[in-house]
């Protein structure tokens, strides 16, 4: 991620639109007052540092420190190696985990207690998620070489371990059985 790309992410996710000006005073005001913008600003900066080679400063180490603080402060654990397009948005910033094997397109809307991960550590498979995807609360996406298409809506409490085609909605049917004693 180069400097221009980082500014583009900040413009879209912190300032609220790709064509909005990136003014330092207004951006700092938003970061200080809004928790989501605070998280996204520091997460994107940490990703930028993580992908830079060591130089005068140990940028990857600085990125890991920023990431550790974000996990403690916000309860969101998105690995720095995960590739997520601009437009990341949270309904509630609690219990969100995204593995480093995730490759996610633009405009992901994610709700609380959602996990995107691989089956086992050391697996080489990636999880591809397209553009304009909406994930409900308590969604669990686990698999290797898993593909979720563009314009997909995943319902609350869904367990996804198979591919989902473009322009689909997906949910897991839950049945509550109540039997007399």
Predicted features and spans:
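Terminal amphipathic alpha-helical/low-complexity segments used for targeting or macromolecular assembly
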Residues: 1-74
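Left-handed beta-helix
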Residues: 74, 79-80, 85-86, 91-100, ...
């Amino acid at each position: 991620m180069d400097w221009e790309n980082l500014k583009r992410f900040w413009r879209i996710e912190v300032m609220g639109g790709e064509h909005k000006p990136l003014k330092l005073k207004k951006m700092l005001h938003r970061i200080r007052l809004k928790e989501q913008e605070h998280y996204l600003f520091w997460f994107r900066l940490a990703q930028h540092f993580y992908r830079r080679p060591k130089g005068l400063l140990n940028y990857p180490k600085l990125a890991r420190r920023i990431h550790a603080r974000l996990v403690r402060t916000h309860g969101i654990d998105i690995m720095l190696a995960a590739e997520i397009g601009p437009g990341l948005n949270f309904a509630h910033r609690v219990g969100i985990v995204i593995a480093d094997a995730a490759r996610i397109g633009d405009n992901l809307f994610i709700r609380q207690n959602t996990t995107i991960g691989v089956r086992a550590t050391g697996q080489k498979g990636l999880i591809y998620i397209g553009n304009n995807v909406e994930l409900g609360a308590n969604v669990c996406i686990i698999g290797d070489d898993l593909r979720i298409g563009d314009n997909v809506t995943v319902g609350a409490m869904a367990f996804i371990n198979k591919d989902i085609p473009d322009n689909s909605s997906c949910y897991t049917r839950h049945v509550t059985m109540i039997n007399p004693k």
